[in-house]
Each structure stands twice: as C-alpha cells, then as structure tokens.
C-alpha cells in the first residue's frame, strides 16, 4: 500500500483502509478518510480549495492560507467535499465573524474572512474569469471599491417562517443546504428596520393564532416575510407570502 501525503486514516489513525494510489497512479479516497491539507484558493461559493496530488477537495469554512484537518464527506472521481475538523494553522485572512450564527446560517459564506481579503478575492475572481473564460490576458482589473461599513447594506430579504422544536413561531434564514430555520432577527447585513418588522409580524401571529406554514404537511398560513427598503426615500415594503386566499386579522397587523 502507498499511503497518500497528508493522510491520517479514519478517526485520526492510519489503518488498512488508507487512501490508495491505483495501478495507473490516480489518487482515490473514500468517505470518512481524514487528511491534513493546505487551502490554496476559494471557490465560487466561498468554500476553501485544497489539493492532494492534483485531486481537489472543497472545504466549507476554510480559507486561503489555512492548514486544516478535514474528513471526506462525499468523494467523486476527480474531487471531493470535505468537512472542516480542525484549523491547525489559521490563515492571515481569518477573523472572528461579527454575527453569532454565521457558521450555522446559510446566508453568508465569508464572515470568517477579513473584509479587505474579501475584496481582494472578488478582484481575483473577476481577473480569473477574464483570463481563463474570456481569453482577455492583457486586461488588469482595478482594486474593488469597498464600503466604509460593510453591514446593514442589503435592501431586500425574504425570511422563512416556521416553528422551533417547542412549537414557537420562529423566523430567520435557512441553515446551509437545508430548510431548517436558524432563528435570528438581527441580521447584520440586512437593513436595521428588518429586526423590528420581524418582531412585529411574529408577535401578531402569536397573538392572533395565525399559523406558520409547515413544509411537511403543507398546512399553515404564513410562509415568508419579504422586506424591501428604499435607501433614498426611507420607504419600506413588507409582503407576507401566505398559503391562503386572505390573511386572517390583517387589520391588527
């Protein structure tokens, strides 16, 4: 057996189930294999990209410059998706997310990356697309112009409504790649008025026993709360997406 560089077995130990090189020297791995890798780049969805002998690993929450321990979750012929287990050496890009639910929530992918590095990553992605896809090798992109305060800037959001395990009405955003709601009303990238609006709507639903929609049995009324703000005028539009012809007790909202 020829064990791969960076391979540390399953559950942290080397064993006979090690990732192998086949006879034609192609790297292979399988679910639950663990590796230590260096993250070299970021993908289009903000996931870290590392390589082992040309084989690509995509690692959520990893950053360029990180040295990490990962576990294979889904292996394909030329690439695999891996789970971040441990940050052995953090990247200079890494910072503490300002949002307390940034890791669970699927709304933001790069809050653990410094804002200056996020802007540099955007510039690099544009440059790569121009060079690799467009063939414009003689064009150089200028630095991305960022915001003075990179929070509370989005003017539109759609918040799903549901129930927690105790039967309480909750709203927030879906966890990544799921329809499980992460209860949170103080999103740092949405307009500050969103928090008060979500609080008002959920209170109205509780007081008037207006149900939230259940995706399993397709019953219930309120599915989403859509909020759009106009930065120039200060106007706010609130729409409730409902599973009914009329919204009960609308006059009390």
PLM regions with names:
Residues 3-12, 16-253:
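Accessory RNA-recognition modules of RNA-modification enzymes
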């Amino acid at each position: 057996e020829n064990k791969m560089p960076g391979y540390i077995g399953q559950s942290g130990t080397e064993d006979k189930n090690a990732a192998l090189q086949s006879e034609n020297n192609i790297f292979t791995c399988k679910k639950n294999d663990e590796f230590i890798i260096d993250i070299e780049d970021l993908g289009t969805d903000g996931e870290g990209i590392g390589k082992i002998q040309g084989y690509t690993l995509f690692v959520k929450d990893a950053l360029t410059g990180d040295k990490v321990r990962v576990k294979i979750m889904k292996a394909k012929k030329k690439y695999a998706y891996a789970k971040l287990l441990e940050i052995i050496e953090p990247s200079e890009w890494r910072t503490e997310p300002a949002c307390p639910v940034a890791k669970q929530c699927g709304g933001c992918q790069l809050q653990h990356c410094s804002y200056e590095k996020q802007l540099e990553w955007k510039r690099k992605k544009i440059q790569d697309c121009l060079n690799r896809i467009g063939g414009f090798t003689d064009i150089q992109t200028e630095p991305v112009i960022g915001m003075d305060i990179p929070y509370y800037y989005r003017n539109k959001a759609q918040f799903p409504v549901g129930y927690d395990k105790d039967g309480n009405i909750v709203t927030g955003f879906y966890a990544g790649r799921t329809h499980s709601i992460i209860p949170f009303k103080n999103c740092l990238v949405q307009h500050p008025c969103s928090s008060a609006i979500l609080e008002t709507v959920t209170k109205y639903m509780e007081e008037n026993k207006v149900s939230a929609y259940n995706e399993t049995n397709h019953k219930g009324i309120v599915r989403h709360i859509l909020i759009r703000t106009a930065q120039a005028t200060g106007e706010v539009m609130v729409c409730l997406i409902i599973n009914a012809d009329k919204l009960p007790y609308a006059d009390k909202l």
